[in-house]
UniProtKB/Swiss-Prot annotation:
Name under which the protein is recorded: Hydroxyacylglutathione hydrolase
EC number: 3.1.2.6
Main enzyme class: hydrolase
Family according to the record: Belongs to the metallo-beta-lactamase superfamily. Glyoxalase II family.
Organism per entry: Salmonella dublin (strain CT_02021853)
Entry's Gene Ontology BP terms: methylglyoxal catabolic process to D-lactate via S-lactoyl-glutathione
Cofactors that this protein relies on: Zn(2+)
Amino acid sequence: MNLNSIPAFQDNYIWVLTNDEGRCVIVDPGEAAPVLKAIAEHKWMPEAIFLTHHHHDHVGGVKELLQHFPQMTVYGPAETQDKGATHLVGDGDTIRVLGEKFTLFATPGHTLGHVCYFSHPYLFCGDTLFSGGCGRLFEGTPSQMYQSLMKINSLPDDTLICSAHEYTLANIKFALSILPHDSFINEYYRKVKELRVKKQMTLPVILKNERKINLFLRTEDIDLINEINKETILQQPEARFAWLRSKKDTF
């Protein structure tokens, strides 16, 4: 399979996974126009859409795409039923698309019904995990989001994290505000700055590398714990996650 990305809105990525025959699955099409343009340019044959959650910038293009390709199956959690989903999916489900098996797991936090789609090495994680960060808690609790991130963190080292937004630079600036002397984060910051100056995307990222620079995956890291302890003593990693998320919300 081949991974492709389509920029949308200000900072969204619509991921498109294609096979050698040109059949494809489209992930979180927030708008239809750029997808239709890419389909025409590459002569792709859309087979399915994956929806991770109900927010408009992830589902806004579904109904128009279905008008052009009514044969498509649209997979999504229950919260996307009125957004164009034709087949509802949830935690533990497996589906076969493009001849490949995808496993779904619930990742509540950003929204209560958020799901991720995984077919090694590709993880389509919507707004749950970003490079250097994680999604805002619009509906879920810090505990829910922490558990969702731990599910992702348990995946193989070579998992490709296909997040839905280009938030990396801002996330790494936040990480440096907490751990300014961390060598991994500083090195990644320089790399990300260079990419963004050239208008190049920073995604996808490899989970093994993400574990080194994403503070939300490092809640048991001694350097981070020592930094948090300067302000408050938090014994549980979930509590440290909540502290981090609160800091990021006002950064």
